[in-house]
Amino acid sequence: MTVTAALGASPATEPAAVRLTGVTKSFGKDGVPVLDGINLTVAPGEFVCLLGASGCGKSTLLNLIAGLDPASSGSIELPGTGSRPGHAALMFQESALFPWLSAGRNIELALKLRGLRNRVERRTEAQRLLGLVRLETSYDKRVHELSGGMRQRVALARALAQQADVLLMDEPFAALDAITRDVLHEELIKLWQETQLSVVFVTHNVREAARLGQRVVLLSSRPGRIAREWRVDIPQPRRIEDAAVTELTRAITAELHKEISRHGN
């Protein structure tokens, strides 16, 4: 486990799936900053966990990367590959599936919006994506027939349907029970290894970050700044109860407590 104080962005010459330089975000008439001077580079195929106290700007940062909201200052780049510009897919804590569509048709809609016009091809691809998340037999199931974990699997398949370079995940497993969350951790890591996507995963769960991330980035309380980062060399697959994961969890928790105390939260 390598610990570094993350104060600057990586050189612009380094390969990047996401590059943020001096990013600041303010809301309201008084312009109080939520994020301040964020410098962060996510390498192609890297799994980065963003961690911090509630209200530190983690979700706001994801929205900026996704293009849902503009930064007040600084630059956000998704270089992409070759001549194709990069783009990101965003997965929320709630599945946000359309309840009047089946699991498969929810994915088909994403494929249609991507530009896949042929219905047969869309159905075939939707079936393939459901297979990736172990829901091969759930194409025709309605949303109300799916458990919370199954809904999040469908939401993940829908995100994958966008063929994005970067997968942004905003506390996607926070509402699930511990056993389901544990299973989905395993499945997410397998998918990440298979697809080689870049992943930016927001969580307030320190153990979750220690289990999943190749790198864990800690944001300070408002205004959110990068306070610390950990480069994690614990091999995957990891378990929550692994000694190395427990040690890392303790180290991150201690720093998180310092940040919370420092800012009076």
What are these regions (language model features)?
Residues 51-53:
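The feature captures the beta-strand-to-loop junction immediately N-terminal to the Walker
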Residues 66:
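Helix-to-loop junction immediately C-terminal to a conserved catalytic motif
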Residues 73-86:
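Conserved ABC transporter NBD signature motif
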Residues 101-109:
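Short coil-to-helix segment of the ABC ATPase nucleotide-binding domain corresponding to the Q-loop/switch region
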Residues 112, 119-138, 190:
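Conserved ABC ATPase "signature" region
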Residues 142-146, 150:
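Conserved ABC ATPase signature
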Residues 161-165:
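A short, proline-enriched helix->beta-strand linker immediately N-terminal to the Walker B motif
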